[in-house]
Each structure stands twice: as C-alpha cells, then as structure tokens.
Design a protein with these regions (language model features):
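Short, conserved active-site entrance elements at the starts or edges of catalytic domains
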Residues: 119-157, 176-179
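Acidic/charged, solvent-exposed loop-and-adjacent secondary-structure segments enriched in E/D, K/R, S/T
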Residues: 98-127
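Bacterial N-terminal signal peptides that target proteins for export
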Residues: 1-9
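N-terminal mature ectodomain segment of secretory-pathway/periplasmic proteins
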Residues: 26-105, 137-144
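Gly/Pro-enriched, hydrophobic low-complexity segments
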Residues: 86, 149-244
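Short, solvent-exposed mixed-charge patches
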Residues: 249-250
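Sec/Tat signal peptide C-region and signal peptidase I cleavage site
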Residues: 18-22
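Bacterial N-terminal signal peptides
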Residues: 8-17
C-alpha cells in the first residue's frame, strides 16, 4: 500500500513539474508577438514617433518634462526631454551614440561613452528585444515563473549582443510585457533598473505600452512616462539620428 501511495505522489509531482516546464522560450515569444498584433504587423512598422510627459521623481520632489521619442528601423533612436525652453537629446544611428546636455551646461553635441552607447542601442529596435532575437545576436532562456505584484509572470532571460542582460516578464494570460529588469555595466560597475509597463494601446494594429514607470536600483531616481500621442510610419530623416556636423566642418 505504501508503495502505491509513493507511486501516486511521484506521478503527481512529475505531472506538476512537466506542466510547469511545458512551455518554451520560443513559444512564449510567439505568444507575445501574437498578443502585440502579429509578427507581420510589427515588421510593417518602419518608424515610430511617441510624444508625452516624463515625470522625474526624487528627493527634490518631482518635475514634468515634455518627452518625444523617434525610432527608425532597423535600429536608430532619438529621445528628447524639454523643459523651460531647453532640450536634452540622446540619439543612436546604428553606429554611434551622442547627446546634448543643456541642463549640465553642455549645449554642444558630444559622443556618449561606450557603456551609455550600448544601453541606448539595446533599446533602439521598434520590435523590442524578443522579436527576431537570434538575428539581433541575442540568446534567450526561459526561467519559469516569478511573482510580480501578485501575478505569476513568465520570466525570460535575454543575453544581449552588447553583453548586457535583461529579464523580461510576460503576463501569463495576455503574454504582454509587464516588467523588464535591465542589468548593464556603467563605468565598470553593474547598474540595474526596473521598468513596469501598462496602458497598452494600438498603433497601426500593434500594441505598445503608453505607461512606463522606471526605478533605478543605484538611487538614480524614478520616472513615470505617459504617452499622449503616437504615430507610425511617418517619414523620419536619417540626419536626425546622426551626430550633427557643424557648418564650419562642411
């Protein structure tokens, strides 16, 4: 009798373990692509312009900044933050990254460090880290589920071509991203930031998060991004992503 009980419990445990590991990383990625609108619709978006408000939250209180982000396939990105007539710019054209930092008293464009350039390049793709990850030089592992604010989210480890690592959490019912944890090297020290996604809305048939809350583990402060307007496949000049060339240099 004892042998039968042990056998039954063993079979139950085996069934539970099999169910927990039945899904693969590639299956989850396919479900995520379908949930967002489908791989074809995602690939059809060649440019994306997002506008909204970015709130910085810290010991100083909070400050709202006008925000705009431009992305162009395959991997160009430019973000702008504007307040009191001054605009902070960060851009990546697929080869090099640069910035304009008027709030630090630097109004001329300057090239970004290698670590900062990698971080910007990691987020440049319109389709995100999961879609066509092999073509992007990444590796992905499925790590099971993890509790995210009461939700048993699917956890994927993304080893990026840059050497940085991201952990992406997918909602178990809708398979959309609800959180990412990015681990990156900054001047020889590992930096970790968390982004929580919500308020998904369609742009040209593809779902994008219109609310992104970020938290930096190293005490860099929190941000809340709210997208108010989105446009896809509008013409974007390559020059807006490239390092500006002064008139005297032409």
């Amino acid at each position: 009798m004892r042998t039968k009980v042990v056998l039954v419990f063993g079979m139950v445990a085996l069934a539970a373990a099999t169910a927990a590991h039945a899904i693969t990383a590639d299956e989850l990625i396919a479900k995520n692509a379908a949930a967002r609108g489908g791989a074809d619709k995602i690939a059809a978006i060649k440019s994306l312009k997002l506008e909204g408000k970015l709130r910085f939250i810290g010991g100083f209180g909070s400050i709202d900044v006008g925000y705009a982000q431009y992305q162009k396939a395959p991997d160009s990105v430019r973000s702008e933050g504007t307040v009191q007539g001054l605009t902070q710019v960060q851009a990546w054209d697929g080869k090099e990254a640069w910035q304009i930092s008027p709030f630090q008293g630097r109004k001329d464009p300057e090239r970004m460090s290698a670590d900062d350039a990698k971080a910007l390049a990691d987020d440049a793709s319109i389709s995100g880290a999961l879609i066509d990850y092999k073509a992007k030089g990444s590796k992905i592992e499925y790590l099971g589920t993890e509790d995210i604010d009461g939700t048993q989210a699917h956890k994927l480890k993304v080893s990026l071509k840059s050497g940085n690592t991201e952990y992406i959490y997918l909602d178990p019912d809708h398979f959309l991203e609800i959180r990412t944890v990015a681990q990156r090297m900054v001047r020889g020290t590992e930096s970790e930031s968390t982004a929580d996604f919500g308020d998904y809305e369609q742009v040209n048939g593809v779902y994008f998060p219109f609310s992104v809350a970020t938290h930096s583990k190293d005490g860099g402060g929190d941000t809340q991004l709210t997208i108010e307007k989105a446009q896809a496949n509008e013409p974007l000049d390559d020059a807006m992503f490239a390092f500006p060339v002064s008139k005297s240099a032409k």
